[in-house]
């Protein structure tokens, strides 16, 4: 959107119970259910704003394209960086957004808008770089300062050939994070 003046970021809580399951089915199913929900919220918002002659564009929650320059998958705009700039939370060592309310258990949506809005205050960093996520990563995708995205994704996402289904098979960095419930719900 060439005339974009604001990015509106929003989040939906991701159920923590999915981290406790031995099966990867609940986590995958919830992720696959939340994604279209977030896209629908963004679309409905854009349609509603047009009643006020405000042009907005929904950014797809999960669709991305390969960037040969960086060797990473990229969306139109980085959801987590936009959410951090919008004051929803801060990005942790594991490269996930951590919010005070929901920790890293949040799924993000975004809308680009031609209307300029007052931004929220940027949050103070939550992650203290304890490196539990670095130590827990089975493929060492967090050893460098920046997530080695393809290494992570090749291990975490894929097909279960036996069951002929697509699964999210790893979320150890999210499991181990002491702030996966946020700071307001932190349990020591």
Per-region residue spans from a language model:
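Non-catalytic, usually N-terminal nucleic-acid engagement modules in DNA/RNA processing proteins
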Residues: 1-31, 35-36
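Catalytic cores of enzyme domains
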Residues: 27-188
């Amino acid at each position: 959107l060439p005339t974009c003046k604001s990015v509106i970021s929003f989040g939906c809580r991701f159920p923590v119970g999915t981290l406790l399951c031995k099966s990867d089915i609940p986590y995958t199913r919830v992720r696959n259910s939340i994604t279209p929900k977030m896209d629908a919220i963004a679309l409905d918002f854009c349609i509603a704003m047009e009643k006020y002659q405000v042009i907005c564009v929904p950014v797809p929650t999960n669709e991305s394209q390969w960037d040969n320059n960086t060797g990473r998958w990229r969306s139109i705009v980085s959801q987590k960086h936009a959410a951090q700039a919008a004051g929803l939370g801060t990005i942790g060592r594991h490269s996930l957004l951590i919010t005070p309310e929901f920790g890293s258990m949040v799924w993000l949506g975004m809308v680009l808008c031609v209307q300029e809005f007052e931004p929220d205050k940027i949050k103070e960093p939550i992650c203290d770089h304890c490196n539990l996520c670095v130590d827990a990563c089975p493929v060492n995708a967090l050893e460098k300062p920046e997530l080695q995205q393809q290494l992570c994704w090749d291990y975490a996402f894929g097909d279960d050939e036996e069951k002929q289904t697509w699964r999210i098979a790893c979320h150890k960095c999210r499991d181990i994070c002491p702030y996966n419930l946020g700071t307001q719900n932190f349990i020591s």
